[in-house]
């Protein structure tokens, strides 16, 4: 009986010590904030926003042109012969189909570009973070998105932002 209590006490003591020791080496980082607040990240966001706005303007212009053509064709419905109207309607339908394909293509290309830019950003900051954790003897860096609640003492986001801006 006495030895069981002793073993349980030792286990509790060891577990508490190991948890306390490991908690000191676990920190978290808000990657989104690093992207939004560093000069390199701001440049990436600015370029992506510019590309997105340009794409949206082109799509809107093409959509408006197609709507005008459709309205014009509707107004000419009674003037044109039935056969001529069908030919123009089919042509307009093909233009709408091409527009939809173009719209999908632009969206896919933008998503690819965005992913490439974000991957490049991660490749850029990864060695910086690795150097930081080596210097600070940190064992694990978690993404803030994956943490339910934690003390702000373990947040290294601001420090990483400063270091990335110095290296960027």
Where do the model's predicted regions map?
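Bacterial N-terminal signal peptides that target proteins for export
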Residues: 1-8
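Bacterial N-terminal signal peptides
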Residues: 8-16
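Sec/Tat signal peptide C-region and signal peptidase I cleavage site
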Residues: 18-22
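Amphipathic alpha-helical segments
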Residues: 23-147, 164
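A short, glycine/Asx- and small/polar-enriched loop/turn
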Residues: 154-156
């Amino acid at each position: 009986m006495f030895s069981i209590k002793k073993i349980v006490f030792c286990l509790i003591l060891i577990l508490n010590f190991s948890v306390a020791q490991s908690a000191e080496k676990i920190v978290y980082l808000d990657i989104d904030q690093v992207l939004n607040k560093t000069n390199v990240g701001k440049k990436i966001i600015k370029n992506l926003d510019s590309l997105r706005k340009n794409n949206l303007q082109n799509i809107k212009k093409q959509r408006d042109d197609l709507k005008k053509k459709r309205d014009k064709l509707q107004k000419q419905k009674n003037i044109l012969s039935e056969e001529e109207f069908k030919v123009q309607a089919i042509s307009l339908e093909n233009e709408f189909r091409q527009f939809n394909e173009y719209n999908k293509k632009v969206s896919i290309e933008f998503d690819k570009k965005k992913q490439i830019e974000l991957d490049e950003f991660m490749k850029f900051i990864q060695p910086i973070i690795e150097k930081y954790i080596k210097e600070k003897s940190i064992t694990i860096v978690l993404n803030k998105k994956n943490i339910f609640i934690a003390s702000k003492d373990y947040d290294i986001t601001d420090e990483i932002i400063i270091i990335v801006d110095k290296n960027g």
